[in-house]
């Protein structure tokens, strides 16, 4: 299960089909220095690697089932995010938002967060409109894993059967990937997402390999 940015980028290059390669910041030094000053301590090495090697220079929309994941552009990465950490009108800090949370992006407005003071913790999605940020859903054990899994879902939904619907609803109401997309995604999502695979699969009934059949016990 890859957890580093270089390993995630190596695997991304094996399937990324976009017209441009968006994961190559041309000049990250200013962003790194700005973040270091905000944090007041050395940045976690995985975050430094993301900023230097992979943060997109423009907001990057990665399609998922439901709302897409929007990764914020390099110059948008900050501990100060209007509407989340601070009031967008007054600029005053909002209560309840941890000062060490860095927004990597959002899913339909739900923030995807890395805690710069606890880099060993999971990258998690939290939910706006619930009155607090007390609980969220872990998505990945690192920024590299988040990037890889989100890009894999995006590719399965947009890059396997271009020009054709990637999703269908079965007779029983199950949401299914197109067969070719499911065949591509199943082994990769299980291997790359590890314990977070079910969260990435979401409502897709065929995003993961079926469980192995149990052999009947002999009498």
List where the protein language model places each region.
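Compact, glycine/acidic-enriched structural inserts
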Residues: 124-159
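Residues in well-ordered beta-strands of folded domains
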Residues: 105, 115, 124-126
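Short helix/loop capping segments that flank catalytic or ligand/cofactor-binding pockets
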Residues: 112-115, 134-136
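A surface-exposed partner-binding patch
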Residues: 1-111, 164-166, 171, 176-219
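Helix N-cap / beta->alpha transition motif
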Residues: 70-73, 115, 141-142
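Short, flexible loop/turn elements at secondary-structure junctions
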Residues: 105-108, 118, 130
């Amino acid at each position: 299960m890859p957890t580093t940015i270089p390993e995630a980028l190596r695997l991304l290059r094996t399937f990324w089909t976009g017209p441009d390669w968006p994961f190559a910041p041309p000049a990250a030094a200013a962003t790194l220095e700005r973040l270091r000053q905000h944090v007041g301590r050395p940045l976690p090495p995985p975050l430094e690697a993301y900023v230097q090697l992979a943060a997109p220079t423009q907001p990057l929309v990665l399609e998922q089932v439901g709302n897409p994941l929007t990764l914020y552009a390099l110059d948008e990465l900050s501990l100060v995010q209007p509407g989340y950490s601070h009031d967008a009108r007054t600029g005053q800090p909002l209560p309840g938002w941890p000062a060490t949370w860095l927004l990597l992006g959002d899913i339909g407005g739900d923030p995807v967060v890395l805690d710069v003071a606890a880099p060993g913790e999971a990258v998690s999605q939290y939910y706006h409109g619930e009155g607090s940020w007390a609980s969220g859903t872990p998505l990945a054990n690192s920024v590299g894993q988040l990037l890889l899994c989100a890009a894999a879902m995006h590719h399965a939904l947009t890059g396997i059967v271009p020009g054709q619907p990637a999703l269908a609803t079965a007779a029983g109401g199950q949401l299914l990937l197109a067969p070719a997309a499911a065949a591509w995604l199943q082994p990769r999502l299980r291997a790359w997402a590890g314990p977070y695979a079910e969260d990435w699969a979401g409502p897709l009934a065929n995003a993961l390999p079926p469980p192995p059949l149990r052999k009947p016990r002999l009498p």
